[in-house]
């Protein structure tokens, strides 16, 4: 066995080793391990040991390695793809450096949240803080929902916000230590997008949709909750979007078969381009995470989705979103790891939202009704079928949901987080011209505008917990814009019922083939339109008018 080894060594003597290969291989192995562990934590309740996975990787996430890749991304003579891959990798390193350095604050906040309980007068025992989202969405009484939020705010005020204030200051300092002018600059580099232009567009969208949004709020809140618009509060939106009147149309075990039917109409199966099946864990395990999630363990061959079957459209919508991630991972053909796993999230989140947004479209809702009818016959079930009036009402509820989140992210989140993260006032000049020195007051003002409901102090105390690290909020805002753009583009190319077009499925596979190398602007060019919120506005107005 010695001779072949000596021959290999001799052949490699003249080849200079790639100084970037080692960190890349180390990161690939680390991400593989982390995602596999996350899968078992989510599906069977294994104790999370993510922190331990970073042990021994200090050099990988050091300032020196980050600086090396930052310099390498500017190197002359490399291909455009290699440059972009290096940029993605450098942004990954910088983000992980911040995450590790601020992990102690996340751990403190997480532990404080896990240990915290609140007293609700109508409940015998203290209620865990972590269960309040579920409780407020299930609570039928508006007064009690407000009390739940007030109790939650006390935990935020006393236990969580002081910790998160320290985290914010530390993150801003660390960004400057890495050579960035600010935390905002680091975040824009990570998202590969500029905040200012999208904030301008977000404000335009907010103003343009204000009358439509308020009319829908008045109509839908009265019908779904029996609450006049003047009495609606932020604490009511969780219950509103849970759509309790329509829950009977979406039994807990319908998620996987209905999603496969959704894909099947477009000629997409739930298999990978490597020939393997997308692995779906839909077991009812009491220890599993209740929210659906997706992992591209090895792209494209090992793609996994976790879902804990729950009734209702809110749960089903989340599964469709995660199914969008799975379809992207499963149909990615690029061999470049950075394009498989790293980079901005706008495309993968956008595909997920495109699938979720189908639930506002009466065309898909009628297809779903036909699916349930066939499913009943095949499985000898008797699940109720939506009437045409049910479809109309559910569509309008979903239109409101989509408007709400676009106004929240494209306007309120971006303005607020630009200020919170120490951005230059030039970012929000002309978009928000009121005082910004008090973050809690600012939060209360911009979110009250976005939601079109008054916000009290208990609502405003969310100003530390309602924050996305490194402006993932920008990825979300861009993904919402992309989802509407893709939905309108598909409709223009393949007709109103593009859900039944195999050509639409082919186009989706083409869009995702290069993974995250394809950015939102690239998709907009494919459909021949600028990347902005005008397709979203047009689609929502069209659906309201139908």
Where are these regions (language model features)?
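Active-site recognition of the HExxH zinc-binding catalytic motif
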Residues: 314-333, 349-353
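N-terminal helix-rich structural modules
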Residues: 14-165, 431, 465, 471, ...
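Glycine- and acidic
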Residues: 149-156, 188, 239-247, 275, ...
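Contiguous, non-catalytic segments that form substrate-binding/exosite surfaces or channel walls
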Residues: 107, 153-304, 309-313, 526, ...
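C-terminal, non-catalytic "cap/extension" segments appended to globular domains
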Residues: 41-51, 69-74, 182-185, 319, ...
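Hydrophobic helical h-region of N-terminal Sec-dependent signal peptides
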Residues: 2, 6-11
């Amino acid at each position: 066995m010695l001779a072949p080894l000596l021959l290999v060594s001799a052949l490699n003597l003249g080849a200079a080793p790639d100084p970037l290969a080692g960190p890349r291989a180390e990161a690939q192995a680390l991400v593989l391990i982390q995602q596999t562990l996350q899968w078992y934590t989510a599906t069977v309740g294994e104790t999370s040991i993510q922190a331990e996975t970073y042990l021994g990787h200090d050099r990988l996430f050091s300032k020196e390695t980050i600086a090396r890749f930052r310099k390498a991304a500017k190197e002359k003579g490399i291909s455009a793809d290699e440059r972009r891959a290096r940029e993605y990798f450098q942004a990954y390193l910088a983000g992980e450096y911040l995450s590790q350095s601020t992990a102690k604050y996340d751990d403190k906040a997480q532990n404080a949240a896990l240990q915290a309980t609140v007293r609700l007068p109508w409940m015998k025992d203290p209620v865990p803080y972590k269960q309040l989202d579920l409780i407020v969405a299930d609570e039928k009484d508006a007064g009690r929902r407000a009390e739940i939020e007030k109790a939650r705010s006390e935990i935020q005020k006393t236990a969580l916000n002081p910790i998160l204030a320290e985290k914010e200051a530390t993150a801003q300092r660390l960004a400057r230590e890495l050579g960035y002018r600010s935390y905002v600059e680091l975040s824009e580099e990570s998202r590969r997008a500029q905040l200012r232009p999208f904030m301008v567009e977000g404000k335009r969208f907010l103003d343009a949709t204000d009358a439509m949004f308020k009319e829908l709020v008045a109509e839908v809140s009265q019908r779904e909750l029996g609450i006049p618009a003047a009495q609606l509060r932020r604490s009511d939106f969780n219950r509103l979007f849970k759509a309790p009147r329509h829950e009977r149309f979406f039994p807990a075990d319908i998620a996987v078969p209905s999603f496969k039917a959704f894909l099947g109409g477009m000629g997409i199966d739930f298999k990978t381009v490597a020939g393997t099946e997308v692995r779906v864990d839909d077991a009812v395990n009491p220890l599993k995470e209740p929210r659906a999630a997706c992992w591209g363990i090895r792209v494209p061959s090992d793609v996994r989705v976790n879902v804990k079957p729950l009734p209702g459209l809110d749960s089903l919508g989340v599964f469709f979103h995660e199914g969008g991630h799975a379809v992207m991972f499963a149909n990615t053909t690029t061999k470049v790891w950075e394009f498989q796993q790293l980079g901005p999230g706008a495309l993968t989140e956008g595909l997920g939202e495109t699938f979720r947004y189908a639930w506002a479209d009466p065309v898909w809702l009628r297809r779903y009704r036909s699916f349930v009818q066939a499913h009943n016959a095949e499985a000898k079930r008797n699940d109720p079928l939506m009437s045409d009036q049910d479809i109309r009402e559910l569509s309008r509820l979903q239109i409101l949901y989509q408007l709400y989140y676009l106004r929240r992210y494209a306007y309120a989140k971006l303005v607020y987080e630009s200020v919170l993260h120490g951005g230059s006032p030039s970012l929000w000049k002309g978009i928000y011209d009121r005082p910004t020195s008090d973050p809690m007051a600012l939060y209360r003002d911009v979110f009250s505008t976005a939601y079109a409901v008054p916000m009290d102090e208990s609502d405003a105390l969310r100003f530390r917990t309602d924050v996305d690290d490194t402006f993932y909020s920008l990825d979300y805002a861009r993904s919402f814009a992309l989802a509407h753009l893709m939905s309108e583009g598909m409709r223009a190319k393949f007709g109103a019922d593009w859900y039944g077009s195999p050509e639409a499925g082919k186009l989706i596979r083409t869009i995702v083939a290069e993974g995250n190398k394809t950015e939102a602007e690239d998709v907009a060019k494919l459909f021949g339109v600028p990347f902005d919120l005008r397709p979203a506005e047009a689609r929502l107005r069209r659906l309201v008018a139908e």
